[in-house]
């Protein structure tokens, strides 16, 4: 009997035993740094001369691992393997597939701190952020396993006398999962197991900045009983391997999480029907945001300030849900702005391996350079209140940065920065604040801080985002509780961790029998 779903609790690091366990996990991971990792194709380990070098963003001299790098030939081999494995895996019972997810979740739960320690080292996540990432990975496995069991017999439809009608779901085929570096365990695992539990086979191309944790997860799935060839681990260049697989005539669907520009490129390339292709490919995409917290004059101003700071600067603002715009009605603008600046100045920036660190590095040199360029733009477009400095001598550290008095159409109010930068804009009233909030090509998350029920109800209908929060920050969606995905250029509104997500990986079949 499968127990009802509940999300994995976060670790309380005020408990000394938990602290000691996490420190021990960090020591274990540090002892394994610098190893080489192969591709996994059909269960076989394939080493390549060309490697992807994963480094610690807090200490770029520290190599996390050197990972084999797939090319087109190896990608083709993986595709043939996955295509062949689909014949048997697609006929494996939903119960058996779900059981593999439950076993994998149990394995990760037993090694929870170890996986979180890999996230500290490879992604630069502070303890709490790493712990939440691992918990979310467990949640995806537990939730999607249960969702597949709910869907396994289809959905009831009507039948007339002398007729029996059945409506049920079957797998699609080979899926290409292109996962991001910012949630390198949770989103990588979630998108992978959603495709697997629905009976598809997977080619997993993890982000080049964080391939080691993906390899560790592939090992977990093997240990949990996933047959060889059902998941093939093939990190590689997006321009070479990514494009090749997106365009491949045997690819049935692509599950992508990443930037708007790459998402658009994938969508365009997947739309073209290749010679020999006998279906229209499906694209499941989550492509970022320009998320806003709106504060009205009747808000709890301390809650507003704390929500903005936590949402803007958690994991250095490297979340597609991060608050990069704070839209405050003019009556309370100065109070909220000044309190946010006070709180921001208190934040601890440093090595994520230290428990006291609130904010670690950004992911790599490219991200560092881009964010620092946006900070220079911000100095022209707004008033720098705090932050603005960076140091990439050892790692990629940027101070949390607040700009005030920014025009709603300014670049730092319109373009996704993906770093620890928040821009403040002043609104005349609540209606104007919503107008500013919706003035973006994205529509992922948003929050409203208000005690005014009429304003909250107005926002419920008019604030055009996929995930809207009242009287809390705009990050931290929980699997099964707040299904996650956005509108417009934030993607295909595929609600990860929601009741209709698995259906995106299947196709419906109707069978009607007369008797």
Curated annotation (Swiss-Prot):
This protein's UniProt keywords:
NAD, Oxidoreductase
Q: Part of which pathway?
A: Amino-acid degradation; L-proline degradation into L-glutamate; L-glutamate from L-proline: step 2/2
EC identifiers of the protein = 1.2.1.88
> Do you know which Pfam families this protein is assigned to?
Aldedh
**Listed GO MF terms:** 1-pyrroline-5-carboxylate dehydrogenase activity
User: Which HAMAP family does UniProt cross-reference here?
Assistant: RocA
Give the protein family. Answer: Belongs to the aldehyde dehydrogenase family. RocA subfamily.
What's the protein name? 1-pyrroline-5-carboxylate dehydrogenase
Where does this protein come from, organism-wise?
Answer: Geobacillus thermodenitrificans (strain NG80-2)
Q: Which gene encodes it?
A: rocA
